[in-house]
C-alpha cells in the first residue's frame, strides 16, 4: 500500500514539473516564433534534452513541441492573412519560415487550402484590421 501511495504521490510532481517546462516553452515560442527556431532551441532554453521536451509536451498537451510550434505559426499566419495586406512571402518570413514554398505546403497540410485560397475565403476588411 505504501508503494502505491508513493507512486501516486510522485505522479503529480512529475506532471507539475513537465507543466512548468511546457509553460516556459510556450512563452519562448510566443516570443520567438518569428525567428527560425527549432525544437533544439526550445529544449536548450528550458534546460531539457530534446527527448525530455517531447515527453513533457506529449504528457501535458498531447502534441509534440514541433506540432505546437507549427500550429502556433499557422494561427499567426491565419490572423495576418485575414487582417493585413502583407504578401504571402512576407507573412511566411514574419512567422519564422525562411522558405515561402515550405510555408505554403505546411499551411495547406494544416488548413486544406493554400494561403492564397484562405485569404480569398476571408476577404480583408479594414475595420477588422483595427
Predicted regions mapped to residue ranges:
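An amphipathic alpha-helical interaction segment
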Residues: 1-30, 52-54
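Terminal helix-turn-helix DNA-binding modules in bacterial transcription factors
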Residues: 27, 31, 36, 40, ...
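Residues within the alpha-helical elements of helix-turn-helix
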Residues: 45, 94-95, 110
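The DNA-contacting recognition helix of HTH DNA-binding domains
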Residues: 50-51, 55, 99-101
